[in-house]
């Protein structure tokens, strides 16, 4: 059970990391689009 919990925490952390990275990329692409306009 402890191992399962660790795996769940790891997956949640991974998801949060991917989400934050995606948001940063989105912000960056929006900024570059605004600059090119």
UniProtKB/Swiss-Prot annotation:
Coiled coil: none annotated. InterPro entries: Rotavirus_NSP6. Pfam families: Rota_NS6. It is found in: Host cytoplasm; Host mitochondrion. Interacts with NSP2 and NSP5. One of its GO terms (cellular component) is host cell mitochondrion. Keywords: Host cytoplasm, Host mitochondrion. HAMAP family: ROTA_NSP6. This is Non-structural protein 6. The keyword tRNA-binding does not apply. Its main location: host cell.
